[in-house]
């Protein structure tokens, strides 16, 4: 397959990912097929975002690492000492992706390290490994282009997380601001009683203790439920089951108390 055709296949990853959740496993599989090597997409903290194996490595430690989806801490830290593509590192390199305890088996193992950069910062590392065949210039062009595409997707995912965070916070603030003073007071007592994200409460008991009517509690819960902040379900004589759906709610409630 020609270099241009392989480049187009990598490019299609971007088009396929548009508007969908990022799938690093599929990206790793695509890179495995066009570069013909084992592929590991590793985050800044060593989390294995995606991987695809071309040549199986029979080693218990490696298997556990793939199951846990986590690279060793020291290895991850050392990757930051590689500021640019470093190719064809042998089994004796500290950056080898082959198990050094089986050095004899993987004597011909070669590793290439490609930093994933985006927005001017190091986002992670693309690690490629294969047995015997050296990584040629065409492989490195594809690896660096692949790392750029992965970097763009990591940035997109980060931006979406920030956007979702802001949206969740805004929904909570609007829901809380819609409560009257007595409703807000009722809600504070309810979640003190729950002491967590979900639980059972008896509205009449809280109403008696705080000195408010039961209808105030019901109205407050209804407002939060219609905003999608909580869900509540009546369990008859047992009381009302409440679950927090928006993880920003309890934080905002705590902030209100401290002011």
Swiss-Prot record:
A single GO molecular function term of this UniProt record: GTP binding
One GO CC term, this protein: cytoplasm
SUPFAM superfamilies according to UniProt: Winged helix' DNA-binding domain
DNA damage is among the record's keywords: no
Feature: DNA-binding region: 203-222
Keywords: Cytoplasm, DNA-binding, Phosphoprotein, Repressor, Transcription, Transcription regulation
A matching Pfam family: CodY
Localization in the cell: Cytoplasm
Chief location: cytoplasm
Biological process terms in GO annotation: negative regulation of DNA-templated transcription
First and last residue of the signal peptide: none
Source species, domain of life: Bacteria
InterPro entries in alphabetical order: CodY, GAF-like_dom_sf, GTP_trans_reg_CodY_C, Transc_reg_CodY_N, WH-like_DNA-bd_sf, WH_DNA-bd_sf
Residues with PTM Phosphoserine: 215
Residue ranges, annotated region (GAF domain): 1-155
Function: DNA-binding global transcriptional regulator which is involved in the adaptive response to starvation and acts by directly or indirectly controlling the expression of numerous genes in response to nutrient availability. During rapid exponential growth, CodY is highly active and represses genes whose products allow adaptation to nutrient depletion.
Family under the similarity heading: Belongs to the CodY family.
UniProt protein name: Global transcriptional regulator CodY
Source organism of the structure: Bacillus velezensis (strain DSM 23117 / BGSC 10A6 / LMG 26770 / FZB42) (Bacillus amyloliquefaciens subsp. plantarum)
């Amino acid at each position: 397959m020609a270099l241009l055709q392989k480049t187009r296949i990598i490019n299609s990853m971007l088009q396929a990912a548009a508007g969908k959740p990022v799938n690093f496993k599929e990206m790793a599989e695509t890179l495995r097929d066009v570069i013909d090597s084992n592929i590991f997409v590793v985050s800044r903290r060593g989390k294995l975002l995606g991987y695809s194996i071309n040549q199986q490595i029979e080693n218990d430690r490696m298997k556990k690492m793939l199951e846990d989806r986590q690279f060793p801490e020291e290895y991850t830290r050392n990757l930051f000492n590689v500021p640019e593509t470093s190719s064809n590192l042998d089994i004796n390199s500290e950056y080898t992706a082959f198990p050094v305890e089986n050095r004899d088996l993987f004597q011909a193992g070669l590793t290439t390290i490609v930093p994933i950069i985006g927005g001017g910062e190091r986002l992670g590392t693309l690690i490629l490994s294969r047995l015997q065949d050296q990584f040629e210039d065409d492989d490195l062009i594809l690896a660096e282009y692949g790392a750029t595409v992965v970097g763009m997707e990591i940035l997109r995912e980060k931006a979406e997380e920030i956007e979702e965070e802001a949206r969740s916070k805004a929904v909570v603030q609007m829901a809380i601001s819609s409560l009257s003073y007595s409703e807000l007071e009722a809600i504070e007592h309810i979640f003190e009683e729950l002491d967590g994200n979900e639980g059972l409460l008896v509205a009449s008991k809280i109403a008696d203790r705080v000195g408010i009517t039961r209808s105030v509690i019901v109205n407050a819960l209804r407002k939060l439920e219609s905003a999608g902040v909580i869900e509540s379900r009546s369990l008859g004589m047992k009381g009302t089951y409440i679950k927090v759906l928006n993880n920003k709610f309890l934080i905002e409630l705590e902030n209100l108390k401290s002011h």
